[in-house]
Amino acid sequence: MEKRFLSADSLVSDGFALAAAVLQSGWQPDHLVGLWRGGSPIAIALHEALAWKGLQTGHSPLAVHSYTGVDQRQTEIAITGLDALTAILPAGKRLLIVDDVLDRGHTLAAVMDALGGRYEVRTAVAWFKPERNETALRPDYHIHETSDWLVFPHELEGLALEEIRAHKPVPDGFL
């Protein structure tokens, strides 16, 4: 499997592109949820772009923990921040869930299950891996499809020293 190294700028561009797709669809979210960690930079850019175009939305993070290492998942997915979200967002509101990638789909499925139909939900991801998706979920909005191993700008785990030197802006003396 080929590794594709992504830049921070590409995630911002993808957030802007997702905002354009949401606006073009005519659907207007009341609230954005960025899935911590990977969905955060994309959700921030998406939120900024919607605001710049005049669409004001609330925003919150949800921390979703399922990976213990590269391509290794826990059997249970823990979600932090759900109580805070439901405390501020009344049932029936339009909620856009934003993540970096829909890979196997289990993270997004766990969030959808936890929300329990409380909201009108749509999903937006920068990257979709349809061949690896083990759920019936498909993102409502996505920019790219791939089967590549995606290496996000913040990721170091699972990389060889040579890959870090070639693709990561680490400071002198760090390695």
Stretches with model-predicted labels:
Residues 1-175:
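PRPP-associated nucleotide enzymes
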